[in-house]
Amino acid sequence: RLGRGDDAVVRKTYHNRGRRWLQSFGRRCRAQREFDNLREVAATGTPCTAPVDWSEQRRFGCVDRSTLVTRWVGSSRSLKEVLAQLPASSAFRERRHLLAAMARLVATLHRGGFLWGAAMPRNVLVVGEPEQAQLAVCDVPAGIPIRHPIHGRPLCLYDLFDGMFSPSRRAQFSAAERWRWLLAYADGDRDLARRLWRTLDRRSVLRHDVGRALAMFWHVYVVQPLRRSRTRTPRPER
């Protein structure tokens, strides 16, 4: 954290070494990807950390390090941290409230046409006290702007698996909690929640990882360049 009051910001620096350094050749740096994605998230109406600026240092076309600057969000902690520290006397009620709020956060992103790529409790900020908290997205370098709704559609499964159906999430949350999470995502639509549950319950980690990698390749290296070429301003005729 740097500065005070409304001017306070958070600066995150990402370093690339070895294979990761070589893979950065000719590509957008992580700080730029996250900066652009946070603006996309804000455009969907989803609360998130506000991007301020980014910078990078390259060598031979590869990124040595990049820095992202975002607004400081006061009185906030990660959802993972909050869930671990809830007092026993109110844990059930507040845990239920927070998980439903996270599911609605993901649903808002998907209705706005954004695939998070890292929909996990550690990447959700809880702003304020848990019982009345507002939730916000805070880490999106792996996100993909799809630009059309993906809520309840095949692409949404990648975020839902990360959010509540990966092996670590299955160990962390009960089946009842995961069902209520899906039901909140589906806005109470039990038929949709059941359909998503059946698909997610059968999904393996290998299938999830391979499918997500293919989806990212298609949208990042095919769809987005085509989109940029179509929206490029034509040169004026001489």
Question: Which stretches of residues belong to each language-model region?
Answer:
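Residue-level marker of alpha-helix boundaries and capping positions
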Residues: 28-29, 96, 172
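Conserved ATP-binding subdomain of kinase catalytic cores across diverse folds
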Residues: 1-80, 89, 104-112, 116, ...
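Hydrophobic residue at the +6 position relative to the catalytic HRD Asp in the kinase catalytic loop
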Residues: 119-126
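C-lobe/activation-segment region of protein kinase-like
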Residues: 133-221
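Membrane-proximal basic amphipathic "stem/tether" segments
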Residues: 210-238
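Activation-loop N-terminal segment of eukaryotic-like protein kinases
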Residues: 126-132
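Inter-helical turn/loop segments and adjacent helix faces that build the functional surface
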Residues: 88-90, 173
